Amino acid sequence: INKIINGIPDWVYEEEFEYSRAFEWSPDSKKIAWCRFDESIVRTFAMSMFKGLRPELKEYATYPGIREWKYPKAGEDNSVVTVHVYDLNTRQTIRQDVGEESDQYIPRIRWTSDPEYLCIFRLNRLQNKLELLRTNYKTGESEVFYNEENKYYLDEKLFDSFTFLRNGKEMVFMSERDGWQHIYMLDLSSRNLHQVTSGQYDDAAILGIDEANRQVYFQAAKTSPLHREVCVTGLDGTGLKKLSVKEGTNDAGFSADFSYYVNTWSNANTPYLVTIHRSGGELVRVLEDNSRLKSILAEFRTTQKEFFTFTTTEGISLNGYMITPPDFSKNKKKKYPVYMTQYSGPASQSVSDSWSFGWENFLAQNGYIVVCVDGRGTGFRGEEFRKLTYLQLGKYETLDQIEAARYLGSLPYVDKNRIGIFGWSYGGFMV
């Protein structure tokens, strides 16, 4: 208890590396690889336990108790992680070589397209150096076949993009090597690296790889950080085409042979529209247009979400949205209170041209102007904008929210003495 975990990540890995399964079946289903987390050296956190109401813990009805968890903190000991493979035919377990260093992370394991070889992601404690190991599962011997370093840190959200093609010769993935999130392809034999997409915008996700036609489908914030387009390009970087038509946020899921895809679209003021298209973008049919929801919303006194930008005293342009009360008019002498909402966490995005409807709309109905501003440190504006907060969390994000409040206070229809701010999670830390 509280020492060894097999195949399920510990708290740090689940929370910070965003995965909950630490095992992988081989392509031929004859081997299973997993991570073993040894928490023996991790210090514990003791929590007082009481009876309570929901749930009611009757064992603590008379006397409170203590429950202990392994809870690593920054600068303290982490779990020691090792990687193992079990062969169902030989019934043998083989430990894989991840190097001598124990104070490191193994944020992912993934089988290559060859069931004889496992790929292990090895990340240093500072999270600025990533190495991909190729191990022969039978011997456990490993070699580094890809490495990447970053002057700030490597974003763990990109780790899931790494895909081994079925031909066994290439690997496609996303990286910030040129300062923007883009798609790359590695030749596994020559180790030559080829950049597939480029430009001063961020790709958001790889949606699928059509190996037969040598094409990759992806989601990009190409026209604006607020938008998402569905695009396709050749793996050689030629023939880039935008498939989505409507401005806003588009996402897609493809059929197994890439003949068709389901596109999900919305914008800030329109709920989801789900459609089927042929691979070239041609519309086949509408699956859901949310007409009933739109009719219901029309019965309420809702107002449109409007986007705006403003420039801070440091010359930084920031994006925001505003929801105004139903009786709002810039020409009136009336001044409105402002409710600012924000999250502001690293690489997050709250200001996007996508559908959402919550209690902020209710506040606007009751006379408040609701405003959200994405400051420095948020996503889809390039690496420099996103990672400016590195090693100084809370500094620039706070300054930008203060700048936003001052900007709002300068508007003729805002009551500058009645501006409040709310945040949740990281946003609560900001407040």
Language-model segments: what does each one mean?
Residues P115, K242, T249-V431:
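Serine-hydrolase catalytic core recognition
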Residues Y19-R21, S79, Y105-P107, N128, ...:
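Beta-rich catalytic cores
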Residues R21-E24, A33-E39, K73-D77, R110-S113, ...:
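Beta-strand C-termini and the immediately following turn/loop, strongest in propeller blades
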